[in-house]
Design a protein with these regions (language model features):
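Conserved AMP-binding/adenylate-forming core of the ANL superfamily
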Residues: 1-39, 43-47, 64-69, 120, ...
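Conserved AMP-binding A3 loop
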Residues: 6-8, 147-171
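Short amphipathic alpha-helical/adjacent loop interface patches that line ligand
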Residues: 14-18, 56, 166, 173
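Structural core segment of the AMP-binding/adenylate-forming
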Residues: 23-24, 51-129
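Conserved S/T- and glycine-rich ATP-binding loop of Class I adenylate-forming
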Residues: 32, 49, 80, 146, ...
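Short hydrophobic alpha-helices that are characteristic scaffold elements of the AMP-binding
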Residues: 43, 47-52, 74, 196
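Conserved pre-ATP/AMP-binding loop-to-beta segment of ANL
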Residues: 104-105, 116, 120-121, 129-151, ...
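Conserved AMP-binding/adenylation subdomain of ANL enzymes
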Residues: 170-189, 195-203
Length: 203
């Protein structure tokens, strides 16, 4: 069964997820990592994480355990939202971390359940539902405040972190809307992986 959300529903779900993150202690400046396919959850993450002033870090699903662990350590991730289909490499990566981080599992109902394993103690939908509908999102007090942290592929060594700021994200989205002459009710097919430069900045 396909999942369909209106923009209003996406906004409300993002608010609730932001609230749920806040309740477990995620705050302004903290990094929240996502390791997931192009699913509604990672899309919502692009909105929910910045709502609490936290920094979104999307990780390439094709990386090995060593590289995943390096990114989680280097980014100082406080939480990891991860698709259970990626359990093999993720479990290896988590074993090498110096400290525990909060793990929130995405359980994709479309996945082959024989190849899915539980990773953390929290499940995305259940966790989201602990959030408050009336949560007051935090606006950035500085346009240069970090909104996301991406990593290079690391072809000549360890991956390098690249910080994007709220100003850049705003100007990119506004400029694209004008340049593409986007209508108010746009249907958009995202074919670029959302872990890759945040879907080339069009999530």
């Amino acid at each position: 069964e396909d999942r369909k959300y209106t923009w209003d529903e996406v906004y409300k779900r993002a608010v609730k997820f932001a609230s749920a993150l806040s309740k477990i202690g995620i705050k302004k400046g903290d990094t929240v990592s996502f390791l997931a396919f192009n699913t509604p959850e990672i899309f919502e993450g692009h909105y929910s994480v910045p709502m609490i002033g936290a920094v979104l870090n999307t990780i390439n699903i094709r990386l090995d355990a060593t590289t995943i662990a390096y990114i989680l350590k280097h980014s100082e991730a406080k939480a990891l939202v991860v698709d259970r289909q990626l359990h093999v490499e993720v479990k290896k990566a988590l074993k090498s971390l110096d400290k525990k981080i909060t793990i929130i599992d995405i359980n994709d109902k479309h996945a082959d359940q024989s190849k899915v394993e539980k990773i953390g103690d929290l499940e995305y939908e259940s966790f989201l539902n602990t959030g408050d509908d009336n949560f007051n999102r935090e606006m950035p007090n500085d346009e240069w405040q970090a909104i996301s942290l991406s990593y290079t592929s690391g072809t000549t060594g360890n991956p390098k972190g690249v910080v994007y700021h709220h100003r850049g994200a705003y100007l990119m989205s506004t400029g694209s809307s004008v340049a593409w002459n986007m209508p108010s009710r746009l249907n958009f097919l995202t074919v670029v992986p959302m872990f890759h430069c945040n879907g080339w900045c069009y999530p």
